[in-house]
Amino acid sequence: MKHKIITFGELMLRLSPDNNERFTQAHSYEAVYGGGEANTAVSLANFNVDTRYVTKLPKHTIGQSAVNSLRQYGVDISRIVRGGDQIGIYFLEKKTSQRPTNVIYNRNGSAFALATKGDFDWDSIFDGATWFHFSGITPAISDNMAEITIEACKEAKKRGITVSCDLNYRSKLWSSEKANKVMSEVCRYVDICIANEDDAVGIFGMDASKSDKEKNAYIAEELTKMFPNFKMVASVWRTETSITTFKLQSMIYTEGKAYYSQEFFMNILDYIGAGDAYCAGIIYSLINDFDPQKAVEFSNAASCLKHTVSGDFNLVSVDEVMKLAFAKAGNEVSR
């Protein structure tokens, strides 16, 4: 079966001070484009999966530059709506040693935030589609976008399209109360859910400490009780092992059983987009009929490799992911 993946969300301009400076020091900024669903689309395109990205961007040259950032990797940009005045921007102060990452959003009033239902022709967008992916960031952007996301889910389900959602709770975008109200409706249409402990706590108020079970398995089990339509819950988490090193592991929960990946110990160049790379790994695994253990290993390796790539996009191939996931290699020189 030939698959076509649709991802839907906001493509933003990311500005980061050079040389790990603070905002108060910065005189120059590195500019790249990214956004959860766009990052997933680029990953899938690099895996040679037919992928269409849907958003709304201004017609000016910055908007066109954002479109070009996707086109160069083979993402189908034919359904991107053009209009509005502003592109969403986020300022990123990168984590350095004990200093945490700091993000400031400037996206209120962006073309995507102000989009209306009439901007998106779902018959055209879903033409030939087999999978629809979005994140919880999209409905958090504005009330309009919450309504549009629900409409998109309904349209996808009407067409028998598989729906996946990365819950991706962002406290800077909406309150727990509002997230709970909207995502409780959205999740009724979701088949594959990607969620971690922060998402479960922030949106649904779960407390894994009350259970003797491993917390990610507990959260996945509780989510499937809340939403019996979930065929799978997947989770990836990063644990700090020292100031400079981290441990990465992930889990897939399906049919009442949890499957865990191997652990990767790593240094981080850029972790933005690592969760989106994981989503791409899950989607790629499922459309290629990987069993749960193979799927969790592949997806975890895809996320691990993203930590080695600067910018939002995970510029790696299926072969590279497979090699890390299953050949247990990566220290030797590739000749």
What are the roles of these predicted feature ranges?
Residues 173-255:
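Conserved phosphate/ATP/ADP-binding segment of small-molecule kinases
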